Amino acid sequence: MHGSNKLPGFATRAIHHGYDPQDHGGALVPPVYQTATFTFPTVEYGAACFAGEQAGHFYSRISNPTLNLLEARMASLEGGEAGLALASGMGAITSTLWTLLRPGDEVLLGNTLYGCTFAFLHHGIGEFGVKLRHVDMADLQALEAAMTPATRVIYFESPANPNMHMADIAGVAKIARKHGATVVVDNTYCTPYLQRPLELGADLVVHSATKYLSGHGDITAGIVVGSQALVDRIRLQGLKDMTGAVLSPHDAALLMRGIKTLNLRMDRHCANAQVLAEFLARQPQVELIHYPGLASFPQYTLARQQMSQPGGMIAFELKGGIGAGRRFMNALQLFSRAVSLGDAESLAQHPASMTHSSYTPEERAHYGISEGLVRLSVGLEDIDDLLADVQQALKASA
């Protein structure tokens, strides 16, 4: 950029990477190519595009200039060769796993997963001959012991939704390379501003870009980043032929607008969450708190090794179980009772009855999701107002 070979900083790339206004009539903001199809100057040119011999667009389910800019920008931020934009986080996850797995293959999974990911695996792809096993991705000995010749993919979230359990990403990647398995990491909670799994050895990163990347709660979107070869496979197999989960150009433009302020928003999310977590840790109504920024967090050292900041998500368990959790939730006034996360607004949800309702009670207990667990997505409001709301809700929960 500007004649320098030095890689620009994160914020600079989030705003400028891959776009030159002079290539687009001087437009400061990238144009939106709101078109389904593209014309060819000749039949021969079109044939070359279809054969992959000529760079070009022919149908927006496969590629679109607006989406391609978003994809290049996300690849730069994650430190990957290529990116792929999709219609939702589940579009990204399903397109990726349908591409990588075949009947008879095995996928090793983190113990705790987002509820819809869990449902897709256990009630979707798992019914087509793909073997599923859950492993603690922080226990590298257990992971090594679980590997078999059929293991094709290792998939996990770090931190995990909703209990914040972390994986040793570099350690997992080292084991996977030895066995020829592909490592896929859901980096939604962190974004590339806080954690870059590809730099730790992962092969692919997936995001629900609906969350922090967008940051405004007004679109659904998904992202995949990895090597050019893997991303091309997912584009031409998982997206084009299997899910069709294409992101609209308009939503891609909104997502790029959100990414421009990602670093500023994440700094604020993290700062607010740290103060709120420290407050919760002192409250008599709280049985247990899960937040990577607290020294009491069991994986505090690992968090400091692979994350630059502890993030904006907090999970905690109230004394009194599910009844206390419901009373707390219903008493909130500033926090909104809603699924999703990463918005400017602070959100609260009860996993047992919301995002992880696809788990049985026994599965939730097995994977560390108690009936009284509350998850907070700490927003950008003034911290004093957030503290006051949580304090009065805690009193109501007792």
Curated annotation (Swiss-Prot):
Binding-site residues, pyridoxal 5'-phosphate: Y59, S60, R61, G89, M90, S208, A209, T210
> Which InterPro entries does the protein's record reference?
Cys/Met-Metab_PyrdxlP-dep_enz, Cys_met_metab_PP, L-Met_gamma_lys, PyrdxlP-dep_Trfase, PyrdxlP-dep_Trfase_major, PyrdxlP-dep_Trfase_small
Keyword Protein transport assigned to the entry: answer is no
Result of changing C116H: Drastic decrease of the catalytic efficiency of the elimination reaction with L-methionine, by 6700-fold, and increases that with L-cysteine by 7-fold, mainly due to changes in kcat
Q: Which cofactor does it need?
A: pyridoxal 5'-phosphate
Q: Which GO terms describe its cellular component?
A: cytoplasm
The listed outcome for K240M is: 50% reduction in alpha,gamma-elimination activity against DL-homocysteine, while retaining elimination activity against L-methionine and L-cysteine
Q: What class of enzyme is it?
A: lyase
E.C. number: 4.4.1.11, 4.4.1.2
Q: Could you state one GO biological process linked to this protein?
A: transsulfuration
Report residues binding substrate: Y114, R375
**Biological role:** Catalyzes the alpha,gamma-elimination of L-methionine to produce methanethiol, 2-oxobutanoate and ammonia. Is involved in L-methionine catabolism. In fact, shows a multicatalytic function since it also catalyzes gamma-replacement of L-methionine with thiol compounds, alpha,gamma-elimination and gamma-replacement reactions of L-homocysteine and its S-substituted derivatives, O-substituted-L-homoserines and DL-selenomethionine, and, to a lesser extent, alpha,beta-elimination and beta-replacement reactions of L-cysteine, S-methyl-L-cysteine, and O-acetyl-L-serine.
Recorded family membership: Belongs to the trans-sulfuration enzymes family. L-methionine gamma-lyase subfamily.
Q: What is this protein called?
A: L-methionine gamma-lyase
Q: Which gene encodes it?
A: mdeA
